[in-house]
Amino acid sequence: MTTTPDLRVGVGGAGQMGADHIQRITRVISGATVSAIVEPDAGRAAAAAAAPGSRAFASLDDALDASALEAVVIATPGQFHELVLVPALAAGLPVLCEKPLTPDSAEALRVLELEQTLDRPHIQLGFMRRFDDEYRALRELVVSGDAGELLFLRGVHRNPSVPESYTQSMLITDSVVHEFDVMPWLAGSPVASVEVKYPRRNDRAPERLREPILVLIELRNGVLVDVEMNVSVRFGYQVATEAVFQTGTARIGQPAGLQRWSDARFSIAEHTSFTTRFARAYDAQVQAWVDAVRDGSLVAGPNAWDGYLVALACEAGVRALSEPGPIAFAPAERPAFYA
């Protein structure tokens, strides 16, 4: 439990996601302050230092040596997560780690082994959809059984465009990664297999990408999930889910922006970025984490074990981009530490 009036949070990574979290903790979150910004790029660190009273460091080790933080948000690119998680756990810091936990399951297992040397889980994963009001309402419907048993889920995940650095495998590891967490959470069952189908290619997509793709996810309880992953749709950012039950259906993620009638046309404003579509979910996620750290429970959402399961699903999904048929996999036995 923190002994200071406000939890002193360090933010690792000052790119788009890190800068968003810095602003969020500074302007929205109660009970916490940004005390350290860990970013090797001096320009980014300076730009992100808008948080009053924060200090910039080139590495987490430097911030730890200066006793500049009590908890850390990791928002670096995924390939660097293990490099930050190891010293954070060694110092006993509570961690909110943006997805993914690590790029592959072998790294994830190493992180799990290190975390289990502590007295309890210290890592919360940044799968913010679990904190979205609509996703929570849908999960409550599934759990209640009011519409009968859940039979299958249908998802769409659409981006207007992606940066030049976005590669084919990132359709899975940077985008569908969210479905690999939230769909099992909704259905109450882990992923058993992943298959990728290719519809007609969008010739307006970047030359390096073959998309959209249709991802078929089978869960261990028999629920089937299909996800349209489309990153060149142009019109906006859209994430939606339909659930089919024994006695009805339910939908979330429908457009809810400005409704306009003009020139004999009707339109509804749509989001253009995940930062606005899930702004409230991000706020709720970070606030829940801060509250958990302050009360000593440390984790108030998906944990490192959930991150390991998602890493396995991503590995299967990347294989499925080039291999036919469902790619099945089985996780290691779940340690009692994560019960």
UniProtKB/Swiss-Prot annotation:
Its EC number is 1.1.1.18. Gene3D superfamilies: Dihydrodipicolinate Reductase, domain 2, NAD(P)-binding Rossmann-like Domain. One of its GO terms (molecular function) is nucleotide binding. Transmembrane segments: none annotated. It catalyses: myo-inositol + NAD(+) = scyllo-inosose + NADH + H(+). It is an enzyme of class 1 (oxidoreductase). GO terms for biological process: inositol catabolic process. InterPro entries: Gfo-Idh-MocA_inositol_DH, Gfo/Idh/MocA-like_OxRdtase_N, GFO_IDH_MocA-like_dom, MI/DCI_dehydrogenase, NAD(P)-bd_dom_sf. The keyword NAD applies. Keywords: NAD, Oxidoreductase. The keyword Oxidoreductase applies. SUPFAM superfamilies: Glyceraldehyde-3-phosphate dehydrogenase-like, C-terminal domain, NAD(P)-binding Rossmann-fold domains. It comes from the Bacteria. HAMAP family: IolG. Homotetramer. Belongs to the Gfo/Idh/MocA family. Involved in the oxidation of myo-inositol (MI) to 2-keto-myo-inositol (2KMI or 2-inosose). This is Inositol 2-dehydrogenase. The gene is iolG.
